[in-house]
């Protein structure tokens, strides 16, 4: 198996491991947090493996410029791997893009419902989630046209539930739409990875099960106090996680964080994510942050094994988190809120 894998994918695996080794280390983050201006941030970044990514930039230093250039580098690395891949890795790489597409669609649906400028929103879309039909949003004037333009004849059409009410799409909370799409995405990606077998199946089903549980718990917590009935909540919970169906059914009925934690403790120990949460100073560490920390550890551990596609998935996840961290630090510097500058998500690469 290892010989077959190396013949087809050995170069891309080695390349991706090299990309990962070039990510920011603890000392790099320390240098960034000591910057006094966005100009300093850009100079510091160019002293890392990013190199002269701002070399051709004519705009004044801003968080938007920094984020765009960082995303462009992620885009270059992704498409280099994608363009040199063969099946089944090509399809696997497409699955990595789908969450970005879903987020872009959710952004545009929310914009349409709130009468925002579509041209401006299109510029805010993540480049990894762009697809040809996305431009059709600009001319959509109602939910029916939006549904036809984006949710039918597009790469993410396969994730649209049959019972999603098209006629009330304009009035649905965009997070509900996103949750339905993500559930279908995770379940189909899980099934695809399981079919691949070998180390890829072992690594990816573990990562996707965690992602499914994270989404379930987050949705359950966010639904507390809402008017979403248990039956509708349950429809948004992915079923490919470690949490069994009885846990999902139970959490769909709960309106108390402590009870959700108790259910998590009984089945998989996720309850520790809630420990001392209310005592974190100034809300610096949220439930989402704790899940991101756990996700970062899991994705770093993916590189301890060989001969599997999981490293491509984990690299994109880690790189996405790195961009998020740099943008957070840049925002704190731009807004002179340096007391919060260290509240980024540590990536244990050292």
Curated annotation (Swiss-Prot):
Disulfide bonds: none annotated. GO terms for cellular component: early endosome; plasma membrane proton-transporting V-type ATPase complex; proton-transporting V-type ATPase complex; proton-transporting V-type ATPase, V0 domain; vacuolar proton-transporting V-type ATPase complex. Keywords: Hydrogen ion transport, Ion transport, Transport. One of its GO terms (biological process) is terminal branching, open tracheal system. It holds the Pfam family vATP-synt_AC39. It comes from the Eukaryota. Transmembrane segments: none annotated. The keyword Transport applies. Subunit of the V0 complex of vacuolar(H+)-ATPase (V-ATPase), a multisubunit enzyme composed of a peripheral complex (V1) that hydrolyzes ATP and a membrane integral complex (V0) that translocates protons. V-ATPase is responsible for acidifying and maintaining the pH of intracellular compartments and in some cell types, is targeted to the plasma membrane, where it is responsible for acidifying the extracellular environment. May play a role in coupling of proton transport and ATP hydrolysis. Belongs to the V-ATPase V0D/AC39 subunit family. This is Probable V-type proton ATPase subunit d 2. It comes from Drosophila melanogaster (Fruit fly).
